[in-house]
């Protein structure tokens, strides 16, 4: 089984234009993501999928590989689907999708998803990771996506709101979605052909498209958190984390 890691990256973020090229300790964010992801064991290849020549030049400048996609992708997974076709991946190839705004991605989290597919081949088409929230302020932060799952660790829902809501207590675990996906190449193509979901559009969470159309998402719980850069002020948090590591 080939394992291809793809990092979708776009320049035109409404909250943070040029985010993939933002410097973190003197190195562009996309380079941090690429280099940390490449430390994961079991990868066949790794590419950045982008539609921007500036990002392409930066990635190639540090020795990374790039696949150029169109600017019309509706979501990161739609961009991944285009990259799959351009790279000529086989239906049973495993695709790992790491977001371009995760400069502190833990390589062992990537390995955890690969191992999940290797241990349970054919049992699911898509998987992702969660992390039990420690900082309670994150629970009500809409930029921190929360998730709930059933007893067999299949996703029930993802939301920017607090889920579940404890009517009589606030003392219960809440899980953050880490935003890293693994799926078969064939399923990515299936996903991209699905119409935009109503809940996906409301929450602006692409993974809800799969749930709305009856597809299961397997969940594994990670021991490590991942800091996503959503706003310029998150850069300082990343630099603090890197300094402490």
UniProtKB/Swiss-Prot annotation:
Q: What GO molecular function terms would the record report?
A: 3-deoxy-manno-octulosonate cytidylyltransferase activity
Please cite one Gene Ontology biological process associated with this protein. Answer: lipopolysaccharide biosynthetic process
Which Pfam families does its entry note? CTP_transf_3
What Gene Ontology cellular component terms go with this record?
A: cytosol
Q: What does this protein do?
A: Activates KDO8N (a required 8-carbon sugar) for incorporation into bacterial lipopolysaccharide in the Shewanella genus.
NCBIfam families per the UniProt record, alphabetical: kdsB, PRK05450.1-3, PRK05450.1-5, PRK13368.1
- Listed name of the protein: 8-amino-3,8-dideoxy-manno-octulosonate cytidylyltransferase
The scientific name of the source species is Shewanella putrefaciens (strain CN-32 / ATCC BAA-453)
Q: What is the lineage of its organism?
A: Bacteria, Pseudomonadati, Pseudomonadota, Gammaproteobacteria, Alteromonadales
């Amino acid at each position: 089984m080939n394992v291809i890691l793809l990092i979708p990256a776009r320049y035109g973020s409404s909250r943070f234009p040029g985010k993939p090229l933002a410097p973190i300790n003197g190195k562009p964010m996309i380079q941090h993501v690429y280099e940390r992801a490449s430390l994961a064991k079991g990868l066949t290849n790794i590419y950045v999928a982008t539609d921007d020549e500036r990002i392409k030049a930066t990635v190639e400048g540090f020795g990374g590989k790039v696949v150029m996609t169109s600017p019309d992708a509706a979501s990161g997974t739609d961009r991944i689907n285009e990259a799959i076709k351009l790279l000529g991946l086989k239906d049973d190839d495993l695709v790992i999708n790491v977001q371009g705004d995760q400069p502190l991605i833990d390589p062992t989290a990537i390995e955890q998803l690969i191992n999940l597919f290797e241990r349970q081949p054919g049992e699911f088409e898509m998987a992702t990771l969660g992390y039990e929230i420690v900082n309670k302020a994150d629970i009500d932060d809409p930029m921190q996506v929360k998730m709930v799952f059933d007893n067999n660790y299949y996703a029930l829902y993802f939301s920017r709101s607090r889920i579940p809501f404890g009517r009589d207590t606030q003392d219960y675990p809440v899980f953050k979605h880490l935003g890293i996906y693994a799926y078969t190449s064939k399923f990515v193509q299936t996903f991209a052909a699905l119409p935009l979901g109503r809940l996906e559009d409301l929450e602006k969470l692409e993974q809800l498209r799969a749930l709305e159309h009856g597809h299961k998402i397997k969940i594994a719980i990670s021991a490590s958190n991942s800091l996503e850069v959503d706003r310029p002020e998150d850069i300082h948090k990343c630099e603090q984390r890197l300094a402490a590591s």
